[in-house]
Swiss-Prot record:
Native source species: African swine fever virus (isolate Tick/Malawi/Lil 20-1/1983) (ASFV)
Residues carrying the site annotation Cleavage: 158-159, 463-464
UniProt similarity note: Belongs to the asfivirus polyprotein pp62 family.
Induction (record text): Expressed in the late phase of the viral replicative cycle.
Keyword Ubl conjugation carried by entry: yes
Disulfide bond residue pairs: none
GO cellular component: host cell perinuclear region of cytoplasm; virion component
Keywords, in A-Z order: Disulfide bond, Host cytoplasm, Late protein, Ubl conjugation, Virion
Protein name (Swiss-Prot/TrEMBL): Polyprotein pp62
């Protein structure tokens, strides 16, 4: 029988010796990576619950229909810091949940917390390899806090809040908001994968709330375009890197100035409020805002019957992919024809009006096709980011770089890199992505819910949509953390994310990554690291 280890390269090895059942639960919840020092810049500390009651509760919830409580409890036991002794239990520290730990008392070999009243002692038999920033503590009594004020990670060489870099040109109010959100997202991803607060979610909800309260006609214009991924919604609504033209989806006068939004946070429960916006995609919402008392108004079908819009889009999809000539010439032209019909006549297969007049007017001149290709690319890159075992700023920088330099929205038709027929002509040569790979992405785009996209109320998502199949294995546990650990609030977002992602194979995602890496510039990585 093998002897027990005396030094440890991993916390999981120590757990295997002391509590293999708990280790199995952590593994089954796809959380082993959370115990790896490589994931965190400042090492990692695990709080082992000595109390059988806590471990039994974790087990009960882990193997229930809703494991979110087990995940949250386990995350409260993981600190993204290397804390080997009570002397290091100081300053701004917290658990993987993002909750700040308030220390009541430290002794030579003991720490007592205020919130949760946990009594912690270092594990006497845990000695990490010299090059591993790992620590294990034993929780003798009490519990780790699941709720409370967040902690702020201190930056090396400066204060808690790094200044927003000013060296970007042009530096517009839209750009300023985007940079602040990107830096906040990068910070919280490095802390806890944004499990406590998602900056993209917060800003998207705030902007939509502002429009709903102060500019209802703008609100009904943009509502059919919002996406279940807050990151996608944020960039499509704000268009922060557009530097040419004045055809913004939301005018400058609405967003900025004495009575403008100006990036103000306007939310109480971002997740619940974000979900509510999708439930407002109804006939009644449109009629309440449109001046139906003084003029006759056709209710757009995206409001009156959004499920049928998706059905007609699916007919177009089927026609394109079952055409007797699916190739690099015919297929992209059929895609363009479908979007041209929508942009010019506000119909899909002569069925319409699909969007409010204000919406379709804002989407002409290839903007609708540009938007939907943008959705597709960001969804793919975002999934790749969230599926990584460890977070790297460089991976997120690829997304930002693509948005800033390859798809800013300055020339919609020239920025089409997957759907444009020009990309498949004999005379077109490009070093960024092979033609066959590009065509594979085009087919994947047609198969996705990003094709001829319209937002759909939450009760319709994943219902009768023919694209939706067995999807539960496609949503990683970390995505739950990224959005929120309240599973009941997440149901709508999870279902929508699954629908979007079903068609994105790993090969397609790798092609997207390759494409982005070879287009754009390196300034974004430098920007995020400043």
């Amino acid at each position: 029988m093998p002897s027990n280890m005396k030094q440890f390269c991993k916390i999981s090895v120590w757990l295997q010796q002391h509590d293999p059942d708990l280790l199995e639960i952590i593994n089954n919840l796809c959380m082993l990576g959370n115990l790896s020092a490589a994931k965190y810049k400042h090492g990692v500390t695990f709080i082992y619950p000595k109390q059988a009651k806590i471990r039994d509760e974790i087990k009960k919830h882990a193997y229930s229909n809703d494991p979110s409580q087990a995940i949250k409890t386990l995350e409260s036991l993981i600190l993204p810091f290397y804390i080997p002794t009570p002397a290091e239990f100081t300053g701004e520290i917290g658990s993987y949940t993002g909750v700040k730990l308030e220390v009541e008392k430290t002794e030579a070999n003991k720490v007592i917390l205020k919130n949760g009243e946990a009594v912690l002692i270092p594990a006497a038999d845990f000695k990490p390899f010299p090059d591993r920033r790992l620590a294990v503590w034993i929780m003798e009594s009490g519990s780790m806090p699941l709720e409370g004020p967040p902690y702020k990670r201190k930056k090396e060489g400066g204060g808690n809040d790094p200044p927003v870099p000013k060296h970007i040109s042009p530096y517009t109010p839209r750009t300023r908001i985007a940079i602040e959100v990107e830096k906040a997202f990068d910070d919280c991803m490095r802390q806890n994968w944004c499990s406590v607060n998602n900056p993209y979610l917060a800003k998207s909800v705030s902007l939509l709330s502002f429009l709903s309260l102060n500019h209802p006609t703008e609100f009904i214009k943009v509502l059919p375009l919002i996406d279940f991924d807050p990151l996608v919604t944020f960039y499509l609504l704000l268009e922060p890197y557009k530097t040419h033209g004045d055809d913004f989806l939301i005018p400058e006068t609405v967003l900025f100035g004495p009575t403008g939004w100006n990036g103000t946070d306007l939310y109480q429960s971002a997740m619940l409020e974000f979900k509510k916006f999708f439930t407002q995609i109804t006939r009644q919402t449109f009629m309440d805002i449109a001046d139906t008392a003084t003029k006759e108004v056709d209710v757009p079908i995206c409001y009156s019957d959004p499920e049928t819009v998706h059905s007609y889009a699916n007919h177009v999809r089927t026609e394109i992919l079952h055409h007797n000539m699916v190739n690099k010439v015919t297929t992209p032209n059929l895609v363009v024809q479908a979007y041209n019909e929508l942009e010019q006549t506000n119909t899909i297969r002569h069925y319409g009006p699909i969007f409010p007049e204000s919406t379709i007017n804002a989407l002409r001149f290839w903007k609708k096709l540009w938007q939907d290709e943008q959705r597709f690319v960001i969804h793919g890159l975002h999934r790749t980011l969230m599926d990584q075992p460890t977070y790297e700023t460089s991976e997120f920088a690829e997304i930002v770089r693509n948005l800033r330099f390859s798809r800013p929205g300055n020339n919609y038709i020239n920025e089409l890199n997957i759907t444009s027929p020009a990309m498949y002509g004999d005379k077109h040569t490009t070093g960024d992505i092979a033609p066959n790979d590009r065509f594979a992405m085009l087919v994947a785009f047609i198969n996705s819910t990003d094709f001829l996209y319209t937002a759909i109320p939450e009760e319709k998502v994943g219902g009768n949509d023919t694209q939706t199949s067995s999807l539960t294995d496609l949503v990683p546990t970390r995505l739950h953390s990224f959005l929120n650990h309240n599973l009941s609030k997440l149901k709508i977002l999870n279902r929508a994310q699954q629908t979007v992602r079903n068609i994105l194979s790993n090969d397609c995602l790798n092609q997207l990554k390759h494409y982005v890496k070879h287009t754009g510039k390196n300034e974004i990585l430098k920007l995020l690291q400043d």
